[in-house]
Structures are given as C-alpha cells and as structure tokens.
Design a protein with these regions (language model features):
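Short, solvent-exposed loop/turn segments at conserved positions within beta-propeller repeat blades
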Residues: 59-77, 130-136, 197-198, 283-290, ...
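Beta-rich, blade/repeat-based domains predominating
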Residues: 33-45, 78, 99-119, 137, ...
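A short loop-to-beta-strand structural motif that recurs across blades of beta-propeller domains
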Residues: 77-82, 138-141, 201-204, 242-245, ...
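Residue position within the beta-strands of beta-propeller blades
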Residues: 49-52, 122-123, 194, 237-238, ...
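Short loop/turn segments that connect beta-strands within beta-propeller blades
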Residues: 85-89, 143-147, 206-210, 248-252, ...
Length: 345
C-alpha cells in the first residue's frame, strides 16, 4: 500500500509499458498557481474548469480515526474550483470546499466536476468524520450560482452501510478509508457514475434523489480503479495497477481490454483514439517529472506522445490538444505549485 495523495490504493508491481520511448516532452505550461489540481473539464460555456484539492486545515477527527498508514489527518476548507481564462488567469468559481491533509503531506479534497443540464456538480473525495469533517462527508455536491455548495449525495454513509465483498486492509500497513475515496465521475444517462478507489467500486448517483447504487464491486480483484472512459456502448475502467477493463453500459460482465501500463490516473477516448495518462514512468515509480501520455489506438498499437510530466492527474481534450494538470500531489502543505500544460496531438 503506497500513499499517492493518500489515494489509499493497493498497488502491486510496476510493469514495463509496451510503448515507444518518448523523446519529445511535447508540452507547454498554460496556467499556474493551482493547489493540488485534480481532474479538469471543459464546461458548457467552453471554458476549462479544474478541481483543486487544497491542503486541508487543522481540524482533527471527530470520530475514531481511520486505522491506516497515512495518519494523522487534518481537515479543512481549502479546496477550490477554478475557471482558466484564455490568458491563463485563474478565476475562482467556488472555494472553501472540504478536504484534508494526511501524515505524508498529501491531500484529498474536491477531485472532479461534471455538469447535468447546465448545473455543476463536484465530487468531494476527502470528507467525513475521520478527516475532521463530520458535516461534510465524501460525496457529491451541487455548486450553486453564488459559489456555495449543497450536498446531493452522501457517499460516506453509503460506504459505511454497504461493505464490499473484500474490505480494504486496516492497520499500520493498511490503506482502509471508512469514509470512502470517490475519485472521479462521469455523466451517463442523466446520472453521475462515480469511481470509488479505496473500496474498488463503481457507483451510480442520482443527483435528483441523492440515491447511491453500487454498480460494480471489484474488491476481490483489487485493481484500484481510478477513471472511466466511454466509446459508444462500451465503458473502460482504468486502474492504478496499469489495467484497463471494459464492460457495457448495463454494468454486466467485466473483461480485460489492455494491461501492463504504469500507474494510470486518467483516460480519454475519442473515435478510435485512446489517450492514457501515467503519473510516473514504469521503470521509475514515484519519480517526479516522469509522467507520460500514451496514445493507444484501438488496433492495439501504443505510442508515447508526451513525457516529463510532474505527477499529473487530470486530462481533458479540445480539438487537437490535450490539457493536463501537473504537480498535482507530492508537494506537502504548500499552495500554488500546480500547473496546467497543453499537449499538441
């Protein structure tokens, strides 16, 4: 168990990715001053929005702390959602969002954003009483026009009431997170599909009713799922173990699509092109400035199109450009070090 942003992931051996060696970094910085930036998306207005996890605060747990290797936790309200203006300036859309800092200096907070019929929703990865945030659980919030937020789904309560088949390991070598670690989400059929990493789950959220349903329980396999992508009626689930799995939109049987990547943190699919974001190189785990973007054609070929990225997490596409959030973790309780870079395809 290794502390990536306190992702609380179960990570096995690093496998050498069968991709062409990258010789051209192929990226440029277009925005700076972000604090632990996570997922990013283009909104209905065409602007680029990014979730920033923040650096937690000084709030101590209000219930029994999580029994894992990442203690102690300190919660706070330093998370933010920013709009990136064309000149690279950051405009705050919402701030004061909940999150926490762990004993390794990594943070979990707001991790993703999505829109349904023009309404913005944000995913809170780092809430709950074990993080000093009893009134702000891990879950989905609606971002109101004035920048305030309102909860629409309590993922912490669902995780606590509905254990998976194989619960995460607790103890000094464990990574259990009783309040949950919902890391990413996508819109599907008017609902939000959330990837919860610590309990190896895919959840469906109805923002109208607040209901939470577990669509997949992969806990016995333990792939540490991170991100979902979609191509037609097929969904692709990429994990930190370097595996990409696929299943239909009915969430039926799961099969292996591809494997032997390094630690996957994002996935983008358009047409016959899949772009896989690795947060570090396979031969240099946990090494700064080694993240890569791999182009994976549906004919099976792979090609590294960008490299030298510093601990990336988020990735979005517009036209023939990818936008990637970098310096997204591993910086301790320091603000403003995160950036967004542009990769030309």
């Amino acid at each position: 168990m290794i502390p990536l942003l306190c992702f609380t992931l179960a990570f096995g051996a690093i496998l050498q990715a069968a991709a062409q060696e990258c010789t051209d970094p192929n990226w440029e910085v277009i925005a700076a001053g972000l604090t632990n930036p996570r997922n990013l998306h283009f909104g209905p207005d065409g602007s680029l929005y990014v979730a920033e996890a923040g650096i937690g605060g000084d709030l101590e747990p209000t219930c029994e702390p999580a029994d894992n290797m990442f203690q102690p936790y300190r919660g706070g309200y330093s998370g933010r959602i920013s709009r990136v203006l064309p000149d690279g300036t950051l405009q705050t859309v919402a701030d004061g969002l909940p999150g926490f800092l762990d004993g390794f200096g990594d943070s979990l907070g707001v991790s993703d954003i999505a829109w349904i019929e023009g309404t913005m929703y944000a995913l809170i990865e780092g809430g709950g009483c074990t993080r000093g945030l009893p009134d702000d659980p891990a879950g989905v919030v609606r971002i109101n026009p004035d920048g305030s937020y309102s909860y629409v789904a309590d993922i912490t309560a669902f995780i606590r009431a509905n254990p998976v088949a194989s619960e995460p390991l607790c103890g000094p070598f464990g990574d259990c997170e009783p309040d949950g670690v919902p890391h990413s989400m996508m819109v599907h059929g008017g609902k939000l599909v959330v990837v919860e990493t610590n309990h190896n789950s895919v959840l469906e959220i109805d923002p109208a009713s607040g209901s939470v349903t577990r669509m997949l329980d992969l806990s016995v396999q333990d792939p540490a799922p991170i991100i979902l992508g979609r191509k037609g009626n097929d969904l692709f689930l990429a994990g930190f173990d370097g595996l990409i799995q696929m299943f239909g939109t009915s969430f039926g049987s799961v099969s292996t699509f591809d494997q032997d990547y390094s630690a996957i943190v994002n996935l983008h699919i358009r047409g016959n092109d899949m772009y896989v974001l690795e947060t570090f190189a396979p031969e240099m785990p946990w090494t700064p400035d080694t993240g890569r973007v791999i182009h994976r054609s549906f004919d099976g070929s792979r090609n590294a199109i960008a490299c030298g990225l510093n601990f990336p997490i988020g990735m979005a596409r517009r036209g023939n450009e990818l936008f990637v959030s970098v310096t997204s973790y591993g910086q301790g309780p320091v603000t403003g070090l995160g950036q967004i870079v542009r990769v030309r395809l």
